[in-house]
């Protein structure tokens, strides 16, 4: 049920656009997988969940956070009117039930959890591998403060580009995105982290469904320096 799941995502700890049905379906179409959303219910209420893409590779049933998606993974409903110990115990029990299901259903699981999910003990207690990652979160609402945080040399490059007539413009040219993507990674020995056709399909799906917008940096004489895709939050 898309409506039930998406309502849960919006109020859950760790809920972001990347766990919504719309995003998972875009990822499934672009990367050849099937969106799986797994819920833990109590008294008819969804209290915890996991999401990712299911694929079968080398004969193994896999559940994974898809390419070009920062995180899917675990979501937890807020626990009301309970002390921290009781809330923690309730969330751990929900995780145990989800882990039971994962171990029975899939041969391999690789999920990147949202930054808000920090307690991995239910997984490590079951001998799952857990790796710590770090990320940056920036508040874009104050443009002056954001500008002050940019490195000086980057600010210099931006000012120079403005003087040369480069400007930000909306675009829906997915082929342009792919050309620049390939041009960038063709120069690197390791190649692209995600195949160009996959990246192109994903961007096309995101733009078509209204989950994001693309912009190009273009000079007055039509030279495009870069393309960026922004994803809408909620």
Stretches with model-predicted labels:
Residues 57-128, 234:
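Acyl-donor binding region in acyl/amide transferases
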């Amino acid at each position: 049920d898309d409506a039930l799941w998406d309502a849960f995502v919006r109020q859950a700890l760790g809920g972001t656009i990347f766990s919504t049905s719309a995003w998972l379906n875009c990822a499934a179409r672009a990367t050849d997988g099937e969106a799986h959303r797994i819920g833990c219910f109590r008294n008819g209420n969804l209290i915890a969940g996991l999401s990712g893409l299911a694929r079968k590779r080398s004969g193994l049933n896999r559940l994974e956070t898809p390419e070009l998606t920062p995180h899917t993974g675990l979501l937890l409903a807020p626990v009301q009117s309970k002390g921290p110990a009781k809330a923690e115990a309730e969330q751990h029990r929900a995780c145990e039930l989800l882990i039971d299901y994962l171990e029975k259903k899939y041969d391999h699981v690789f999920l990147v959890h949202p930054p808000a999910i920090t307690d991995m003990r239910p997984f490590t207690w079951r001998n799952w591998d857990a790796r710590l990652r770090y990320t940056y979160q920036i508040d874009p609402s104050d443009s002056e403060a954001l500008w002050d945080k940019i490195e000086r040399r980057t600010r210099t490059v931006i000012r120079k580009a403005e003087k040369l007539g480069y400007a930000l413009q909306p675009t829906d040219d997915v082929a342009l995105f792919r050309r620049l993507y390939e041009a960038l990674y063709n120069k690197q020995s390791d190649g692209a982290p995600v195949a160009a056709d996959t990246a192109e399909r994903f961007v096309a799906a995101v733009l078509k469904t209204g989950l994001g917008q693309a912009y190009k940096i273009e000079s007055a004489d039509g030279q495009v320096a870069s393309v960026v895709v922004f994803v809408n939050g909620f």
